[in-house]
From Swiss-Prot:
<dbReference type="InterPro" id="IPR046885">
    <property type="entry name" value="MnmA-like_C"/>
</dbReference>
<keyword id="KW-0820">tRNA-binding</keyword>
<feature type="site" description="Interaction with tRNA">
    <location>
        <position position="337"/>
    </location>
</feature>
<dbReference type="Pfam" id="PF20258">
    <property type="entry name" value="tRNA_Me_trans_C"/>
</dbReference>
<feature type="binding site">
    <location>
        <begin position="7"/>
        <end position="14"/>
    </location>
    <ligand>
        <name>ATP</name>
    </ligand>
</feature>
<keyword id="KW-0067">ATP-binding</keyword>
<keyword id="KW-0694">RNA-binding</keyword>
<dbReference type="Pfam" id="PF20259">
    <property type="entry name" value="tRNA_Me_trans_M"/>
</dbReference>
<dbReference type="GO" id="GO:0002143">
    <property type="term" value="P:tRNA wobble position uridine thiolation"/>
</dbReference>
<keyword id="KW-0547">Nucleotide-binding</keyword>
<comment type="function">
    <text>Catalyzes the 2-thiolation of uridine at the wobble position (U34) of tRNA, leading to the formation of s(2)U34.</text>
</comment>
<protein>
    <recommendedName>
        <fullName>tRNA-specific 2-thiouridylase MnmA</fullName>
        <ecNumber>2.8.1.13</ecNumber>
    </recommendedName>
</protein>
<dbReference type="GO" id="GO:0103016">
    <property type="term" value="F:tRNA-uridine 2-sulfurtransferase activity"/>
</dbReference>
<dbReference type="GO" id="GO:0005737">
    <property type="term" value="C:cytoplasm"/>
</dbReference>
<keyword id="KW-0963">Cytoplasm</keyword>
<feature type="binding site">
    <location>
        <position position="33"/>
    </location>
    <ligand>
        <name>ATP</name>
    </ligand>
</feature>
<feature type="binding site">
    <location>
        <position position="125"/>
    </location>
    <ligand>
        <name>ATP</name>
    </ligand>
</feature>
Amino acid sequence: MATIVVAMSGGVDSSAVAAMLHEQGHNVIGITLQLYDYGIAVGKKNACCAGQDIYDAKMVANKLGIPHYVLDYENKFKESVIDNFVDSYLHGETPLPCVQCNKSVKFRDLINTAKELGADKLATGHYVRKINGYNGAELHTGLDTTKDQSYFLFTITREQLEYLSFPLGGFTKYETRKLASKFGLDIADKPDSQDICFVPDGNYKTVINKIRPEANTSGKIVHINGFELGEHSGIINYTIGQRRGLGIAYNEPLYVVKIDPSNNIVYVGQESALHVHEFIIKDVNWLADEIKDHEKLAVDVKIRSTRPPCHAEISKLCNDRIKVKFLSKEKAVAPGQACVIYAGERVLGGGWITSNIS
């Protein structure tokens, strides 16, 4: 049997994975990352990697009789994820910290730690599938489409994918909870994490203001036709597609359609101004063969984790950039979010949406 490190967040998914692999006879080692201030985390519910979660992971490991280690990654998490999150908002973007965490902290460092422990693989509780294809491992969506997490894993490398294991890829959430209950785990009915783990009560502005007090610099709210409508209290308070809380009066509904951080301006317009035909993504990571120069490829893309995939055509630009052209216009494409590229259920790759949107 294999030696397998399980990334244990303290939730039902990773706990069920640890129990399942242990029952199969594998040598299981649990690792939990402490990612942010333990004082803030204590008693905080529905968040990943909180103080209660670390305790829950330890209790599951004790019940299973497996080794369990808690690694303090608070400083690295702040540098790689929280600071990036704050700067992204100041640049007029809508950040995606869970993907940055997977890329910069969880997978890279957990894999290194697992290898140092002599493990054959690292297992997680993500709802995705790894399928052995003709040219190596492929990342596919989870069978439970309501829980599929492939959107958040597009930054893993092909080499990392070979080492990873996703035992829940063929499970539904209901089946996972039943499995945890069968193993007698107290967390079988624990609610799923909802918040960004380092954002108390979902109020991200508190985090930004603490790190960048200058973030609330006021500026103009301007209609896309050029006339000024009012004043905003800081661009961090706005995101593309936002309608509520604009604080301006107009004869029809207005939406945030563009944020100009250089001039500290929030642009608003009618809903029709949100519809996008094409845009550019940068820092593209490929989990399949890279698209060739001058090639146009028909694919499906996801521009938000909560949206279904839509049909598009992609073509290669220079400097690891890809042009994405929708077959039908889509609404509210936000810089800073991810665009993940699919061929059916397979993840081909993905990148970060830039401000080059038309």
